[in-house]
Amino acid sequence: MTTELFSQLRNATAASHRRLDAEIDVCGEGLTLDRYGSLLMRFHGIFSTLEPQLAAVRGLDELDFDLDLARCCRTGWLSEDLEVLGMSSRGILGIDESLHPHLVTAVPEALGCLYVIEGAGLGGQVIVPCVQRQLGLTAVHGCRFFAGHGLATGARWRRLGATADQYARRTNTHARIEQSAVDLFQTFLRWFSEDAHGNGIERRAVVGRAVQH
């Protein structure tokens, strides 16, 4: 069941969501290891700064949605996947951070971010079979980031939806939550459509390339 808040956020971010899906296009034909690695590096550049911020937001851990934000899971999963693609630990530490970091300091803004992040987790369940078919990677080997929380993904999404909706009603912060979700989509779009070094994302290769099966 979709909550009133999440319906509002879905409508507000629909256009950006479609643009980002088209930009990433993981399930499109012709996905290569180089391009897949470049996409993972881009995700790492955002999550490596965003997840610690979310974990540090005061009051967020008091909400009853049990998302275990302190573990910064997605950054760790991205690192695991990049290691499978042949990138060294030192190389992963040197990955560029997003040129447009999304700053999060309060609960409403954090909830807007979590809408985007946890929603992407739902999409990840569709992406894993695409990556496995084209690249031979699996949910536990090279595609850990997109596999996310696996079978628990749907329950996490519903729990977040109910909790965020209750919080927004109680604090009258619908507009702030919506703006944060919109802004984070824009952060992703900017970072995936530009390159600090002047090279297109299609041409950015991961160091190593050798995939250990």
Question: PLM features: what roles do these ranges have?
Answer:
Residues 1-213:
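Metal- and O2-centered redox machinery and metal/ROS homeostasis
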